[in-house]
């Protein structure tokens, strides 16, 4: 899964800020690629208003 940090977490709860950090996102427009697991999907669901998500196949992965 390719996750892009699109909106600042300023003004949101500390739990949501911690979730952004735990996904490895630090700066706006930063992109991380993470495995498609239930844990990662749960974290994305908590901050879905702050990020965009793309499904990435094995051949597209870096």
From Swiss-Prot:
UniProt keyword Transmembrane, yes or no: no
GO cellular component, as recorded: cytosolic large ribosomal subunit
GO biological process terms, semicolon-separated: translation
SUPFAM superfamilies: Ribosomal protein L30p/L7e
Swiss-Prot/TrEMBL keywords: Ribonucleoprotein, Ribosomal protein
InterPro entries tied to this protein: Ribo_uL30_ferredoxin-like_sf, Ribosomal_uL30_bac-type, Ribosomal_uL30_CS, Ribosomal_uL30_ferredoxin-like
Molecular functions (GO terms): structural constituent of ribosome
CDD domains: Ribosomal_L30
Source species, domain of life: Bacteria
Family statement: Belongs to the universal ribosomal protein uL30 family.
Subunit annotation: Part of the 50S ribosomal subunit.
Name this protein carries in UniProt: Large ribosomal subunit protein uL30
UniProt organism field: Herpetosiphon aurantiacus (strain ATCC 23779 / DSM 785 / 114-95)
Encoding gene per record: rpmD
């Amino acid at each position: 899964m390719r996750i892009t940090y699109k909106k600042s977490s300023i003004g949101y709860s500390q739990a949501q800020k911690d979730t952004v950090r735990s996904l490895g996102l630090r700066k706006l427009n930063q992109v991380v690629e993470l495995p498609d697991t239930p844990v990662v999907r749960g974290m994305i669901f908590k901050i879905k208003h702050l990020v965009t998500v793309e499904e990435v196949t094995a051949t597209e992965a870096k």
